[in-house]
């Protein structure tokens, strides 16, 4: 029987320390500049924290930007109730270790109505538990700027989003009504009720993220590294089969194999990949020959009626 205890140690598999090359240093400098600009321009910034690798890099950069002081804004985790167990344990340990002001929000309507990815489908579940939940949390905190970890190389709609992404009072995004950004000069002037999503990692790639994690020895959720884990194949994805809420459908068989995740989200909507990469070096080598986006492992991105751009227009991350 596999060990059911989540592996949450805040450290990475043994890796040779890599120096920060000029390319990564330039990306780091740009990201730190964006953090400081937003903190100076806006009254109530917040950082969206989804616990994944991009959020871990984002947090590391925020800590660098304001060192030796504490991170001067809270972290917001919109919890759907369906995250991997390892993610929640890692989140709590990270918040304690770095003395972070962590806000957790769960959409009370979704919880009361028992909205699940199994009963309502990925599109409705994401809209209610993530998009609606995020809007609720931003309104409750009266935040006028929210840092996010999106990168332009992830997906088409994110590729055309500016570093300062302006949102209406109801948090909607109009990609045709965004301001020009000249070099590193950002216009943060907003009207009452409007807000900005700021993306310090916009110009990073997935490989940049991993090389920076290696160079800076940034801890990650262990699910990013290959390990023998139980899974079921469903809708063309390998779904982790550790949570008792995952019921096998007719014809499904529980399997075990060496798998890992390139992206993390809600466990029923996030597919693993077969992999032997158990170290940072092996993950990077694997990514350097990858031919598909990491977002291919997200069920919510496969549904054309719930495409990423549509979600973002409505207020999604």
Swiss-Prot record:
Q: Which GO terms describe its molecular function?
A: ATP binding; sulfate adenylyltransferase (ATP) activity
Pathway linked to the protein: Sulfur metabolism; hydrogen sulfide biosynthesis; sulfite from sulfate: step 1/3
The answer on whether this UniProt entry bears the keyword Zinc reads: no
Gene symbol of the encoding locus: cysD
Q: Which InterPro entries match?
A: PAPS_reduct_dom, Rossmann-like_a/b/a_fold, SO4_adenylTrfase_ssu, Sulfate_adenylyltrnsfr_sub2
Q: How does it assemble?
A: Heterodimer composed of CysD, the smaller subunit, and CysN.
Swiss-Prot/TrEMBL GO biological process terms: hydrogen sulfide biosynthetic process; sulfate assimilation
Family that this chain belongs to = Belongs to the PAPS reductase family. CysD subfamily.
State the UniProt keywords alphabetically.
ATP-binding, Nucleotide-binding, Nucleotidyltransferase, Transferase
Function (record text): With CysN forms the ATP sulfurylase (ATPS) that catalyzes the adenylation of sulfate producing adenosine 5'-phosphosulfate (APS) and diphosphate, the first enzymatic step in sulfur assimilation pathway. APS synthesis involves the formation of a high-energy phosphoric-sulfuric acid anhydride bond driven by GTP hydrolysis by CysN coupled to ATP hydrolysis by CysD.
Q: Which Pfam families match?
A: PAPS_reduct
**Which of the seven top EC classes does this enzyme belong to?**
transferase
Does the record's keyword annotation contain NAD?
no
Indicate what this protein is called per its UniProt record.
Sulfate adenylyltransferase subunit 2
Q: Which residues cross the membrane?
A: none
Q: Where is this region: Disordered?
A: 1-21, 298-317
- Swiss-Prot/TrEMBL catalytic activity: sulfate + ATP + H(+) = adenosine 5'-phosphosulfate + diphosphate
Write the Enzyme Commission number(s) for this entry.
Answer: 2.7.7.4
Chain coiled-coil ranges = none
Organism equals Rhizobium leguminosarum bv. trifolii (strain WSM2304)
């Amino acid at each position: 029987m596999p060990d059911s205890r989540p592996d949450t140690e805040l450290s990475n598999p043994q890796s040779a320390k890599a120096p920060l090359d000029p390319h990564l240093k330039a990306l780091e400098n740009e990201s730190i500049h964006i953090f400081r600009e937003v903190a100076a321009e806006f009254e109530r910034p917040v950082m969206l924290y989804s616990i994944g690798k991009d959020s871990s890099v984002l947090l590391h950069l925020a800590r660098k930007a304001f060192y030796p002081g504490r991170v001067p804004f809270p972290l917001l985790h919109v919890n759907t109730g369906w995250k991997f167990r390892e993610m929640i344990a890692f989140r709590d340990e990270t918040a304690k270790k770095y003395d972070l002001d962590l806000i957790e929000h769960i959409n009370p309507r979704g919880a009361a109505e028992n909205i699940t990815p199994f009963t309502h489908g990925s599109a409705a579940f994401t809209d209610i538990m993530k998009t609606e939940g995020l809007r609720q949390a931003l309104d409750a905190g009266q935040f006028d700027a929210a840092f996010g970890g999106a990168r332009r190389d992830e997906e088409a709609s994110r590729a055309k989003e500016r570093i300062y992404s302006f949102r209406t009072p109801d948090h909607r995004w109009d990609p045709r009504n965004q301001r020009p950004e000249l070099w590193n000069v950002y216009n943060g002037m907003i009207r009452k009720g409007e807000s900005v999503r700021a993306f310090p990692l916009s110009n990073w790639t997935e490989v940049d993220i991993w090389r920076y994690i290696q160079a800076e020895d940034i801890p990650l959720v262990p699910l990013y590294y290959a390990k023998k884990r139980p899974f079921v194949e469903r809708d063309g994805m390998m779904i982790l089969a550790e949570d008792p809420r995952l019921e096998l459908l007719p014809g499904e068989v529980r399997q075990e194999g060496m798998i890992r995740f390139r992206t993390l989200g809600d466990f029923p909507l996030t597919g693993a990949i077969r992999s032997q990469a158990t170290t940072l070096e092996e993950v990077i080598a694997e990514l350097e020959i990858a031919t598909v986006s990491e977002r291919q492992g997200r069920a919510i991105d496969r549904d054309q009626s719930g495409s990423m751009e549509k979600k973002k227009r409505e207020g999604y991350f």
